Amino acid sequence: YYESAALYPILYKYFQNGFKWIAGPKPLLNYDSSLPYYRDGDAIELTDEDVKHQKLTGGRLEKLHKLAEKEILFEAANTVRMGKDLLYLISSSGNKLGAQWLQSVLGNEYRVHTTEDIYRSSHIDSTVMCLRPGLVLLNSARVTEKNCPKIFDKWDKLYFEDVAPTSESELKIQKEIRDPIGHKINELGFKTNLFDMSSPWVGMNLLSYDQETVLVDERQENLIKLLEKNKFNIV
């Protein structure tokens, strides 16, 4: 509810300069908005992505769930914008109602494209990164030629998945601090996301400064090499 408040000084500056400022409806969440991803625990089958995830995170698996379609639910990181087109990931961080609301607000000037086959968890920025018009970076642990969103049919594609493993310091904090606190919270009868860690592929979440310059995590040496090979300046 209050995360976006940190950006208010910037948003007000934009607003005073003529920008439109819209915000999604706040959900009531007076029900269980999370639905089981699998029918039951016995239905879980590890995918190739799951196995790769375990190797990169010391054996951990992502906790998966789906969102109910009772209210508009989505996070901004669930979308990536390419000019007048937006790609929206239907996932644990955005439901179909969210995509419908976004299209209704943006109107005919923008087109909202949905995908739900490329990533089962939250946010799109560890799966799809648009580097410049006509060139996209795709997480090959999730995206293939078969399930690649149609919006990229005419784009050049860089498939990549060889990110650096989750750091030992991050794993140590998770095991020694977050996990124990999470268990205590569960014992009190509350739910918590303290058991969840960022995907190791969040290392693909670079920042484009312009069409030739990108800011990349210095640990992601393989990604840096790929981008340099494709004539990008790396910061």
Cite the ranges covered by each PLM segment.
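The feature marks the mature, well-folded catalytic cores of soluble enzymes
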Residues: 1-235
